[in-house]
Amino acid sequence: GDESDFDTVMDALNDPANRKDLGAFYTPLPYVKEATKLVRQAISNLPKGMDYVILDRCAGTGALEHYLTEEELSHVILNTYEIKEWLVLYNKYIGKVRAIIPPLSMVQENKGNLVTGGDALAEEFLSIPMETDGKHNTLQEVIDDKNVAIIGFENPPYSSELARAQEGNVKSIDKFSYIRKLMSDEFVGDSNHAKDLLNQFVWSFEKYFMRDENDYYILFAPVKYWKSVGLMQKIFINGFLANRGNFKAQESSVLVALWKNDQDNETESITVTAKEIWRDNKKWGTGKGAAVIDVPEDAILKDVKHVT
């Protein structure tokens, strides 16, 4: 069949146990389409002619990139940690995106279910070579190039840290990520927050990729990282609420937010529109049922209410 059949099969192949371990949940396309508007808003805010990269360190099979144009894709840098997902990502996007981490040659030497060099929370991640035709060979080179804006576009995993020790791939001594250790040491606040994978992704994005006012982060995540943990004390530009029940998970709300890298310690609440997936005048089902795996492209988003 076509590419989307392949994705669906791959999504099913990533058995629920493994998916739960990685904290991964598929992002339904109607939400992706809406979030793509936030990416374009960030791009349109950049100084005229400025180069940029769109970074997704936890891309899975590349659902978030589905609606990007050819031109936009040529700015994208992708990474994912699970081997089956990485192979789908590579086959789907090689030659279309600016870079994929790590290069195929590294992945071919791989053993086990996780990609060597694909762990976004590892110490060496920023210096892992990228497979690219661009001028930067590593993420560190991108970070060091002040003429390139960085726009993050991510739906990070939310599972507990123990997921990292899954299936004996990671020796128990290594089960805490480098970023977790660093965040425990450096984060101003309760160091217990560093146990949460999502917080590690958000904290590390702020630390490494938000360098000046031209850097942005479009993030799918439950709002607690901002509200109670105190991460991303930045200017909120725009966003909406998604129903996490549409992501093969329990019903709860996910904030899809566009953050600009300007400090904001004053704002205590933000108001956004909650959107739910509808098709044929019916609300789309939620939960772990098979129906959720493939929300059709012709489903629409309906504004449910304004939430503060």
Task: Enumerate the predicted regions with their spans.
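Internal, well-ordered alpha/beta segment that forms a basic, Gly-enriched binding/recognition surface
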Residues: D144, V148-Q166
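S-adenosyl-L-methionine
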Residues: K92-V142
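A mobile, often basic/glycine-rich helix-loop segment
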Residues: E161-A194
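Flexible, glycine-/basic-rich loop-and-beta segments that form/coincide
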Residues: S253-V307
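Short catalytic/ligand-binding loop motif for oxyanion handling, primarily in non-cytosolic enzymes
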Residues: E65, S159-A163, R211-D212, Y225-G230, ...
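Class I S-adenosyl-L-methionine
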Residues: G1-N91, K96-I101, D119, E123-E124
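An acidic- and aromatic-residue-enriched active-site/binding cleft used to recognize and process polar
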Residues: A59-G62, Y81-K84, N155-P157, E161, ...
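Conserved Class I SAM-dependent methyltransferase catalytic core
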Residues: E186-R244
